[in-house]
A protein has these predicted regions:
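N-terminal subdomain of lithium-sensitive/metallo-dependent phosphomonoesterases centered on the IMPase/IPPase/PAP
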Residues: 1-108
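General alpha-helical segment detector with a strong preference for membrane-spanning helices
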Residues: 69, 116-118, 149
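Hydrophobic alpha-helical membrane-insertion segments
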Residues: 74, 118-121, 154
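Short, glycine/acidic-enriched loop or turn micro-motifs at the edges of active sites
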Residues: 91, 112-115, 148
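Short glycine/proline-enriched turns and hinge-like loops at secondary-structure junctions
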Residues: 97-100, 118-122
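Amphipathic alpha-helical segments in well-structured domains
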Residues: 104, 122-125
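Asp-based phosphoryl-transfer active-site loop
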Residues: 105-118
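Acidic beta-strand-loop-alpha-helix segment within the catalytic core
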Residues: 124, 128-190
């Protein structure tokens, strides 16, 4: 994906804190990766087999899984901050741990929906990544819907749903009591 677009997104998301901006930009880029693979009718090819008992019922690692994970890894490496990545595909990967500071834990499912993607069912495709501090306290999390291209995210300020177009958030809704009432949903908080 384009480094220029990624940097532009970081600039546009910079009103949010640095980690959340990075999280949003990474998931937006993952949505681009999935769209590009889907549009070209590629990405469903098996590139690896999972070894061992983990997900023995689903041993295939598809290109869409690998490409989105590689995108996350690339951006975390470029960020230059110590990170311990816990990923569905790669397991535990230490990134920039030679740099000073306590590492962040980053947990991701680079692409959820591989079986559906492989069979051409364009629904329930997601990419998610969450950031935690060195004591595993949550910082922020983003879940991107690869079909609708919406990103749901949560941080210390609450939970939100954002529409991303290009390098910008064009619409953002706080998922609070007012939102639930507008959707006709019961209040679940006190």
């Amino acid at each position: 994906m384009s480094d220029k677009l990624f940097k532009k997104r970081l600039e546009n998301f910079s009103a949010k804190d640095e980690i959340l901006a990075y999280n949003l930009a990474m998931v937006a880029e993952a949505l681009d990766t999935v769209k590009e693979l889907s549009d070209k009718n590629i990405g469903w090819e098996e590139v690896e087999k999972r070894l061992g008992e983990y997900k023995s019922w689903d041993p295939d690692i598809l290109r869409v899984d690998k490409d989105t994970e590689n995108g996350y890894r690339k951006r975390l490496e470029q960020w230059g901050i110590p990170v311990i990545l816990l990923s569905e595909e790669a397991g535990r990967v230490e990134i920039n741990t030679d740099k000073p500071g306590e590492p962040f834990y980053v947990v991701c499912d680079p692409f959820d929906g591989s079986y559906l993607f492989k069979h051409g069912v364009r629904d329930f495709w997601y990419s998610s990544i969450a950031f935690y501090d060195s004591h595993f306290n949550p910082i922020c999390c983003c879940v991107g819907d690869c079909v609708s291209r919406k990103i749901a995210y949560a941080c210390k300020n609450g939970a939100y749903l954002a529409d991303i177009e290009g390098e910008k958030i064009v619409r953002e809704v706080k998922l609070d009591k007012k939102y639930r009432q507008s959707m006709g949903r019961p209040d679940v908080t006190e």
